[in-house]
Amino acid sequence: MKVILKEDFINLGREGDTVEVRDGFARNYLLPKGFAVFSNKHNVEIFNQKRRSILKKQETKKQIANDLKSKLDLVKLEFFMKSNDSGKLFHSINSLNIAEELFKLGFDIERKKIDIHHGTLKTFGTYDVTIKLYEGISSIIKVEIKKEEKQEDKKPLNKKLNKVDEQAERERV
């Protein structure tokens, strides 16, 4: 079945493109959700008239994606995770965790645009994560998973710091 897309679809086409899809996909998903319309003479004429505005909109999206790429290339995310004694993480990092951290930094990135090559990150280390922004435009951010120090480890360190502070205080007086 031929349909005309009303918005961009990854691996399918861009807004205004006439594409051939399976009947069930068109009837059960694209048409009811308003993502596409039937490709008939009337709809083709309407989209031909809108072609300039569609091209201008695509150029704007491309420019926004390039600006976002330049900002995202500077981002490095750090996650502090708990692990067992052998170093295995209790919780893995997935695209949702990365999307939430990016949102905290002011980037509104959809989860489906984040591509973790291994699916989830399950061990300590530094990883490259690809974010697909627009056709052919993607950004690679660094994601580092570090070990969260246990409370027991922090207490002696704080006591040592307090002793150093007390000695410095005595020397001032």
UniProtKB/Swiss-Prot annotation:
Keywords of this protein's UniProt record, alphabetized? Ribonucleoprotein, Ribosomal protein, RNA-binding, rRNA-binding
User: Region (Disordered) spans which residues?
Assistant: 148-173
Its cellular-component GO annotations read: ribonucleoprotein complex; ribosome
Task: Give the molecular function GO annotations.
Answer: rRNA binding; structural constituent of ribosome
* Any one Gene Ontology BP term: translation
Keyword Nucleotide-binding on this protein? no
Entry-linked SUPFAM superfamilies: L9 N-domain-like, Ribosomal protein L9 C-domain
InterPro entries hit by this protein: Ribosomal_bL9, Ribosomal_bL9/RNase_H1_N, Ribosomal_bL9_bac/chp, Ribosomal_bL9_C, Ribosomal_bL9_C_sf, Ribosomal_bL9_N, Ribosomal_bL9_N_sf
Q: Which Pfam families match?
A: Ribosomal_L9_C, Ribosomal_L9_N
Quote the function comment for this protein. Binds to the 23S rRNA.
- Family from the record: Belongs to the bacterial ribosomal protein bL9 family.
- State the name under which the record lists this protein: Large ribosomal subunit protein bL9
Species this chain originates from = Borreliella afzelii (strain PKo)
**Origin organism lineage:** Bacteria, Pseudomonadati, Spirochaetota, Spirochaetia, Spirochaetales
